[in-house]
Amino acid sequence: MNGRACRILQEGAAELGVEISDELVTLFSLFADELKKWNRKINLTAITGDEEIALKHFVDSLALCRLVSGDDELLDLGSGGGFPVLPLALVFPTMTAVSVDAVEKKIIFQRHAARLLGCRRFEAIHARGEDLPRMLERRFNRIVSRAFSDIPSFARMALPLLMPQGTIIAMKGRGGAEEADAARGALEEMGLTVVRVTEYRLPFSGDARTLVEIGFC
């Protein structure tokens, strides 16, 4: 990444309460370079500029740091090029992080990136979300996604994999709070409820973002 992108990463993360050391900047820069290189061959992301990657992939993913920790067992459903799961795995190296996507080439990239970045507690699985309950015996206390278009569909897929005291976290944009309100009825039918809605602005761009936390009733 260029110098401005590195500054966006560090300063943007700091606005969200996350300290990014110079060592981590080097790792994130390596991640960005690999993402761009692989993206020339396979379609991983439409976001290709250094500054955009730093802000819309890295900083955006790190907004979850306020809701997760290094002790978590985290599952990212529909992770695409590795977001938000790989940035979280870099910041929390002790976190058990599992990434799932239905597109095999994206999972192959994630495995390569994780090896390159030294993410030892990271696993990437090529699967459809609905197939996971019969593939995985384990359960997770944090299940996250920024890929799903609607909250009930995400919650329905995550529910069989959620620990009793765990939370499902949907990363949404503008209108996320209203979407959470509209989903309450469907969630209650699943035995779930909206625990908390956090609205904030993405640093530098000012774009509206919403984190919707969902737990058992």
Swiss-Prot record:
Alphabetized GO MF terms = rRNA (guanine-N7-)-methyltransferase activity
Please list the residues that bind S-adenosyl-L-methionine.
Answer: G78, F83, G129, E130, R146
The EC class name is: transferase
Localization of this protein: Cytoplasm
Keyword hit for Nucleotide-binding: no
Q: Which UniProt keywords apply?
A: Cytoplasm, Methyltransferase, rRNA processing, S-adenosyl-L-methionine, Transferase
Listed under catalytic activity are: guanosine(527) in 16S rRNA + S-adenosyl-L-methionine = N(7)-methylguanosine(527) in 16S rRNA + S-adenosyl-L-homocysteine
According to the UniProt entry, what is the EC number of this protein? 2.1.1.170
Q: Which InterPro entries does the annotation name?
A: rRNA_ssu_MeTfrase_G, SAM-dependent_MTases_sf
Parts forming coiled coils: none
Q: Name one GO cellular component term.
A: cytosol
Asked if the Swiss-Prot or TrEMBL record annotates the protein with the keyword Hydrolase, the reply is: no
Q: Tell me the domain of life.
A: Bacteria
Q: What is the annotated signal peptide range for this record?
A: none
| Record-linked NCBIfam families | rsmG_gidB
What does the function comment of this entry state? Specifically methylates the N7 position of guanine in position 527 of 16S rRNA.
Family listed: Belongs to the methyltransferase superfamily. RNA methyltransferase RsmG family.
Q: What is this protein called?
A: Ribosomal RNA small subunit methyltransferase G
Record the organism: Geobacter sulfurreducens (strain ATCC 51573 / DSM 12127 / PCA)
Q: Which gene encodes it?
A: rsmG
